[in-house]
Design a protein with these regions (language model features):
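A glycine-anchored, Pro-Gly-centered beta-turn/N-cap motif
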Residues: 99, 104-110
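Bacterial N-terminal signal peptides that target proteins for export
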Residues: 2-19
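N-terminal edge beta-strand
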Residues: 34-52
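Extended, polar beta-sheet/loop recognition surfaces of beta-rich domains
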Residues: 51, 55-62, 119-134
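Aromatic sugar-binding surface patches on proteins
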Residues: 91-97
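Short, surface-exposed alpha-helix to beta-strand junction/turn motifs within ectodomains of secreted
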Residues: 57-58, 62-81
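N-terminal signal peptide c-region/cleavage motif recognized by signal peptidases
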Residues: 29-31
Length: 134
């Protein structure tokens, strides 16, 4: 076998090894994309609502562990008005929190800290507004 054929064979093997390594890294990273990021909420971010909903409902992109997760509603000045989290086995990607009634119009913040079923903690917050009754 000539030297050029050996060199081509070696470069083909290197290319195959690099392609295999790239595929492995691509598929190994997939579980990291499964963290429980917020995908829907009621009320949602920047919503203006005429009445406070009875329940705050958050939906995540992957399952969460309710026993190790917390939701809270805060007033615009940072006072915690309600805290907790309720999850149901039939809807593992959703958490709810009973909202306090009789709140004054203004800005409210929903904070969440959830434990994903993949073991990662995801935290975030958003605001919504309770408008004055007309």
């Amino acid at each position: 076998m000539s030297m050029s054929k050996l060199a081509r064979k070696g470069s083909t093997r290197r290319a195959a090894a690099l392609a295999t390594a790239a595929a492995f890294l691509l598929f190994a990273a997939a579980p990291a994309l499964a963290h429980s990021f917020l995908v829907d909420a009621n009320p949602s971010s920047k919503d203006h609502v005429d009445a406070m909903p009875k329940t705050i409902k958050l939906k995540f992109g992957a399952g969460v562990e309710p026993a190790y997760s917390t939701l809270s509603i805060e007033s615009g000045d940072g006072k915690v008005l309600a805290k907790g989290a309720v999850g149901k086995p039939e809807t593992p990607r959703e958490l709810t929190l009973d909202a306090p009634g009789d709140l004054a119009p203004g800005r409210y913040v929903v904070r969440y800290r959830v434990l994903s079923q993949d073991g990662h903690i995801v935290e975030g917050n958003y605001e919504f507004f309770l408008d004055a009754k007309k």
